[in-house]
Design a protein with these regions (language model features):
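Gly/Gly-Pro- and Ser/Thr-rich, intrinsically disordered tail segments characteristic of DNA damage-repair
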Residues: 1-118, 300, 313-314, 319-332
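Basic, nucleic-acid-binding surfaces and adjacent catalytic neighborhoods in DNA/RNA-processing proteins
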Residues: 22-39, 53, 151-332
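Phosphate/anion-contacting hairpin/loop surfaces
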Residues: 69-184, 190, 197, 202
Length: 332
């Protein structure tokens, strides 16, 4: 799932392409947006786009006349900006969910199941927005609000709480793994068990690593570390493997050596959320894969499986067929 840095870069591209331009055509294929446009025909046509911005994983465009559009990528969505006469505009891909055309550019949304439109204050009209915690890329980052919201969940593990978008908006699976590694924290430690130094570290590393990922295309390690990972055969998978293993400290580096110590990076499913099903009354559990270094992060031995470094250092199958089937549960 695209996280805060990726969505912010999308918002930047759309803002550059659309802000100040007049909309010549506006169309949507998602059920809710399509119904709204049917009730308000031509509402967006002829109106000027004022700005496009992001809050966490949510992208919002404000349009003249108190109008707005809103998207959430979930796992697969993406905005593309192309020329108005591009083939993609002429042919209309079946994955397209929305399109916004001006004289100078076309913005096409693919595969995202969440696209809504409306009139009024987005924070009043879009239920998810007012619940969001501080944006991880906000300048300055509201560390006090982040720590206050984190402290409201004393019985959750830190690894689970960081995925809660009401705590901090924009953290997903790669950022939480990297943040916890940077703070040398056990993902299974309870929020109530954190000391002052750990809280301060989280408040510092959440915006720091998010900003680095935003500025460097998702990379969370310094350039020197990435070069070391790429050059040292022992620190990466075989050449045909995905480039993720040279972009991060621990994320998707299972069974590779930690770049700080001699241990191996591990992965394990972590319980991140549970709720009671309204119909069956049964408890439903949501788990996500967490990546960590047992030694650097002092992880409780009960969560540490034996390292299985592969001869050709291929990534485990589970890394590329990640069974995260409910992206909305923690990442709304």
């Amino acid at each position: 799932m695209p996280e805060g840095p990726e969505v912010q870069r999308s918002a930047d591209r759309l803002d550059e392409a659309l802000a100040g331009r007049t909309i010549r055509a506006f169309d949507a294929r998602t059920k809710v947006a399509k119904a709204w446009l049917a009730d308000h025909p031509g509402a967006f046509v002829g109106k000027r786009v004022e700005r496009v911005w992001a809050h966490g994983k949510h992208l919002v465009g404000q349009v003249e006349g108190d109008l707005f559009f809103h998207s959430h990528y979930l796992m697969w969505g993406k905005w593309h900006v192309v020329a108005p006469d591009d083939e993609a505009v002429r042919t209309r891909d079946r994955r397209e969910r929305a399109r916004i055309l001006t004289d100078d550019a076309a913005a096409l949304l693919y595969s995202a199941p969440k696209f809504t439109v409306g009139r009024g204050d987005p924070y009043a009209e879009i239920p998810a927005l007012p619940r969001l915690g501080p944006d991880v890329l906000a300048e300055p980052f509201d560390a006090d609000a982040f720590l206050d919201r984190l402290g409201e969940q004393p019985d959750r593990t830190v690894g689970a709480a960081l995925l809660d978008q009401t705590v901090a908006a924009g953290i997903g699976n790669y950022l939480r793994a990297e943040i916890l590694y940077a703070c040398r924290m056990d993902p299974w430690r309870l929020v109530s068990e954190m000391d002052a130094d750990e809280r301060d570290c989280l408040a510092r590393e959440v915006p720091h690593l998010s900003q680095r990922a935003y500025e460097h295309g998702g990379r969370t390690v310094p350039e020197a570390v990435q070069e070391r990972q790429a050059e040292d055969r022992d620190l990466r998978y075989s050449p045909h493997a995905h480039a993720w293993n040279t972009r991060h400290w621990v994320f998707r580096r299972t069974n590779l050596p930690c770049v700080t110590c001699d241990d191996y990076v591990r992965q394990k499913h972590q319980l991140t959320r549970e709720w009671t099903d309204d119909e069956s009354g049964e408890t439903v559990e949501k788990k996500r894969i967490i990546y960590f270094c047992p030694t650097c992060q002092g992880v409780d031995p009960q969560y540490v499986t034996a390292a299985r470094p592969h001869k050709d250092r291929r990534p485990p199958d589970s890394e590329w067929a990640d069974p995260e089937q409910d992206p909305e549960a923690d990442d709304a």
